[in-house]
Structure formats: C-alpha cells, structure tokens
C-alpha cells in the first residue's frame, strides 16, 4: 500500500476535497510540483491551471484552480485556491468565448491597464482549456 498524506483543497466558496492522497501535482510559480508523503515543508504560489489529485488507492481527480497557495507540512498538504472547480465542471464553451474576447481586447488595446487585464484573462482561459484537455486524456 502506498504512503499517503492528508490533503485539503479549499477555495473562498467551499471545501473541494479533503482526504488521503498518494500524490498531488500542481503548477507553482517556479514550475511543476509533485507532493507525496515525506515531502519537505513548502509554501508556493500557484499558477492558474490543472491540479491532479491521486487519491489513496490510485484513483485520480483533476481540478482547475485560478491561482492560490500550496502549503506542505509533515502530515498535511493544504491547497488554498482563489477559485477551484472540478475539471468536469469547467465550461469549455465559456472558456473558448473568454479566450476570444481576451484576444480581441489585446488586439484593440487602449491602455496599459486594459492590456494587462486582457492578458490575465487570456492566460486564465487558456489554463481552463488545458485543464479540459488533460481531463479528456485521462478519461480515454
């Protein structure tokens, strides 16, 4: 039986997951993070994108987070997300529309603030679409 660690995934709206995991995989600002039992203590900012939770027993769940923080302690992993959604609940049509609108806003930039906002919206829409693609690969 694989070694496990307790993991909590929370957002401002709700608790998304709480239970034992064999591994949690997320993207921090410095790159991919794979957290397993025995990992050194860590605090990292998260980038928007997919989070893979490999539960006790090997089943996997994929989430989308819009950013947040990951804290690793000896017996607890806590992911505090700005927004967290199960990948199966991400609306692909809405993400594609948001991507198109952000690309349009980037092309018609009127000021630095609008450009920065559009770039952030584009990055978030792209991250949502990548999460949907990962979920589709996982389901095959």
Swiss-Prot record:
The keyword Ribonucleoprotein does not apply. It is a peripheral membrane protein. InterPro entries: ATP_F1_dsu/esu_C_sf, ATP_synth_F1_dsu/esu, ATP_synth_F1_dsu/esu_N, ATP_synth_F1_esu_C, ATPsynth_dsu/esu_N. Pfam families: ATP-synt_DE, ATP-synt_DE_N. GO terms for molecular function: ATP binding; proton-transporting ATP synthase activity, rotational mechanism. Produces ATP from ADP in the presence of a proton gradient across the membrane. HAMAP family: ATP_synth_epsil_bac. This is ATP synthase epsilon chain. It comes from Marinobacter nauticus (strain ATCC 700491 / DSM 11845 / VT8) (Marinobacter aquaeolei).
């Amino acid at each position: 039986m694989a070694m496990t660690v307790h993991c909590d995934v929370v957002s401002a709206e709700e608790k998304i997951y709480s239970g034992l995991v064999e591994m949690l995989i997320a993207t921090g600002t410095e790159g991919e993070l794979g957290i397993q039992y025995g990992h050194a203590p860590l605090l990292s900012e998260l980038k928007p994108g997919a989070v893979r939770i490999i539960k006790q027993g090997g089943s996997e769940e994929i989430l989308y987070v819009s950013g947040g923080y990951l804290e690793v302690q000896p017996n607890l992993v806590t992911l505090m997300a700005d927004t967290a959604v199960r990948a199966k609940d991400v609306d692909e049509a809405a993400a594609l529309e948001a991507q198109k609108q952000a690309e349009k806003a980037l092309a018609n930039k009127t000021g630095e603030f609008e450009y920065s906002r559009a770039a952030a919206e584009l990055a978030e829409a792209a991250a949502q679409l990548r999460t949907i693609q990962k979920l589709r690969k996982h389901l095959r």
